[in-house]
Amino acid sequence: MTHFEEAELTSLIDWRKSCKEDGLSFSLSAYFIKTLVIALKEHPIFNSTLDEKNDVIRLHDDYHIGLATNAPDGLIVPVLKHADQKSILQIDEEMKELTRRAQNNELKGEDLRGGTFTISNVGPLGSIGATPIINAPQTALLAIHKTKRRPVVTKDDQIAIGEVMTMSMSFDHRIADGAQAVAFTNRWVEMLEDPKRLVLELI
């Protein structure tokens, strides 16, 4: 099953620009992963795998995020290990290194094993929507699509131009249901649309 959602990122983009002016440069993808881990901790069913042989759902205490990446020989999914223990800057640095190694065919087997949840950022390719394929035996895969400038209604009921990103999450309906998926993405969207929420989570 696939659930579709969107997030208005103007506040996040402005905050990232402010951080860059202060000498802290990082990709939006790194912020996505940092906040995604917080949402996964609150909704652990999505940080699980299905052991079909033993008919058991295994919840994981480790947060190993698979990064769907274009490589010379096709799609590959290196794994960012222990994402919950890393800062946004550390995540950004490790993501760039894993991507570089993937594009240069330098990944080792251990770099591809152990993922508990996968994220695919296809926005730079121009995608505005798709039904992603789950990286079994994981429970879900989240695809991030293109951010587009669109008219939005602000909190004070004004019309403004916003930076709207669409996303789609496919999940194994044997493990999680639609209500759980909506609650999970709603929590993540809260932190995307209001980056101050991340600060509150880390206090």
Q: Language-model features: where?
A:
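C-terminal catalytic/motor cores of large multi-domain enzyme assemblies
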Residues: M1-I203
